[in-house]
Amino acid sequence: MKQHIFLVEIGTEELPAKELRRLAQYFTANFINELNANGINYNDINWFAAPRRLAIKVNSINSIPTKSYMEKRGPAINKAFDAEGKPTPAAIGWARNCGITVNQAERFTTDKGEWLIYRMLVETKPVQKLLCSMVYNALTKFSSLTKIMRWGEKNYKFIRPVRTITLLLDDLVIPGNIFGIDSNRIILGHRFMGESVISLLHADYYPNVLLERGRVIADYELRKDTIRRNIEIMVKKIGGFTKINDKLLEEVTSLVDWPIVLTASFNANFLRIPAEALIYTMENNQKYFPVYDAKGKLLPYFIFVTNIESTNTNQIVVGNEKVMRSRLADVEFFFNIDRKQKLEDYLLLLGQVKFQMELGTLLDKSYRLEILASWIAEIISTDIKQAARAALISKCDLMTQMVFEYPEIQGIIGMHYATLDGETELVALAQKEQYLPLFSGDNLPTTLVSCAVSIADKMDNLAGIFGINQQYTKQANDPLALRRAALGILRIIIEKQLPIDLLSLIDKAVFLYNKKLTNTIVVEQIIHFMLNRLLSWYKKQGYSIDTINAVMAVYKPTGKLIHFDARLRAVHYLRQIPHAENLTKRIFNIIAKHKDLINGEVNFTLLKQPEEVILINSITQLHKKLILFFEKGKYQEALWELINLREIINTFFSKIIIMTENKELCINRLNIINKVRQLFLIIADFSLLQCSKEKSNVD
């Protein structure tokens, strides 16, 4: 069967740069689905994307689709034939609808039985007659991915207005009309360089013709790599280093057809401004790449990418430096206005900003945070005064001009202004770290003072929003960042090993709202919500659901959260030891079967066998030791001590008849076993563990 190369290029107005890769990959995925649905085999497929085009090149595509069959299942054999083996009316009617006789039908068998079936060969069309409709189908699915524009008299809909449609199978133009445009072999080159209109003779020539004649690097990855390599070359020339922001690199790649990388500079006096503000305006406003020294300090240079090759690059550099100077002058202006007063002077202005309509102002929140952070600081044994100070001024930078213009650097600006005001290093750092972690897997606050402020801020948000029943916890997204806040609190407490219990923390946060909250079950709801987040977090870490549930069953919110973590790790450890897991299963299963017979304490006067005496004495002695382990959160050590009773317990089971006819003895022996079970229950409810082994990929 002859194989061909197929090319489709959709020429458009400028596509959204931040979405270009996603759009190209989505178009490709849609077209692959069309190929598969039509039974068309191919070798491989390449996608191309540039600011004004999306393209796909399919290599070694078959000219004729593979044969496909349409199946029509008939009645089951036991209903298709009567006792004499003659077709029933049901079988005859089904066959008539298929245009065959019952004798022409095939049979197929599954584990559920045998049926009649009719397989009909579906008539296939040549690939040439399918390609245009396949492309159209792939393009019309974009409305589910992104915002769509409308244009033309017939109100065509696509991401951006379409100007050209190129469909080539080898050197043959595939006829068709998409968005009111007839397909042809015309592709457009660079707007200002090379050939603006190119007639493409063969599908295989596509990327090279655009490169050589059109001055367009259609290959997205090649264009991106070209930019990256040239940035590194230019940075070395000025003796600097760069931290290439991949999101910025992706966006710049999507903005240019023919990338030319150049270096420019700005006045070093601007470096007195907080570096993050300069970097923000360079990367986000101008799409420039900052340059750093070997220690990571910002240098007065930047790298930029232009979309045109010029004999006078100096003019381009000067133009970009002029734009950059204006941008940095704006930043300097905002900075100078802000520094006319101290950070703490913005505190009372927070009284003019609502935190939430029913929850008061940001000033109210700041006073709550001051108290809550102090309370947390005392529990975790860090500096109470510094935690209180950091929390009180933590929202002040929200009232500054800098944060108003560049909201993404809130907290960072607070840190710099606090430092300039002479606040302690701990207080200043907490301004930045109060928002950590920003996302799943993000870094945590580095100091205990920062931890106290971060937990206080997140817990205040949860208490307030749940307290007025404004939570949206069932939505796929997280509009009020409640899930993120809950997970942040949990991660900080557990990973930093802070001795905080959830119930006290939630109670304190709710109490500080001073009766503003209307939800009477707010504490219970927050606990339930946070424990669900805890379960999800541990699942993602590789713990099995039954292990988590076993610990969750005995955990009380009044207990320290770090003890939950210690219990979980202990149970996970136990599940790697087969004989240990078998021991717990045996103990819990016996009690589960005879729980109605258990009546409490062991009667020592009924101990008749030495194995009974040895076991109960061992339990009594061990209990005192375990209490110390439990108080210190050493659950793995405690569990190991319990497992070390294995030989004594196994001897008890092998030598003692538990279900003896003497009911009094029977109950007493069950009480002994229950004593062992109760010690295990302090750690987890092992009866909830399934037979499957715990995953071993947990850190």
UniProtKB/Swiss-Prot annotation:
Quaternary structure (record): Tetramer of two alpha and two beta subunits.
Highest taxon of source: Bacteria
Keywords: Aminoacyl-tRNA synthetase, ATP-binding, Cytoplasm, Ligase, Nucleotide-binding, Protein biosynthesis
Name listed for the protein in its UniProt record: Glycine--tRNA ligase beta subunit
GO annotation terms (biological process): arginyl-tRNA aminoacylation; glycyl-tRNA aminoacylation
Top-level EC class: ligase
Subcellular localization, as worded in the UniProt entry: Cytoplasm
Family (UniProt): Belongs to the class-II aminoacyl-tRNA synthetase family.
Record field: catalytic activity: tRNA(Gly) + glycine + ATP = glycyl-tRNA(Gly) + AMP + diphosphate
Gene Ontology cellular component annotations, sorted alphabetically: cytosol
Organism: Baumannia cicadellinicola subsp. Homalodisca coagulata
EC number: 6.1.1.14
Keyword Nucleotide-binding: yes
Keyword ATP-binding attributed: yes
Alphabetical list of HAMAP family matching this protein: Gly_tRNA_synth_beta
Pfam families: DALR_1, tRNA_synt_2f
InterPro entries for the chain: DALR_anticod-bd, Gly-tRNA-synth_bsu, Gly-tRNA-synth_heterodimer
Gene: glyS
Molecular function in Gene Ontology: arginine-tRNA ligase activity; ATP binding; glycine-tRNA ligase activity
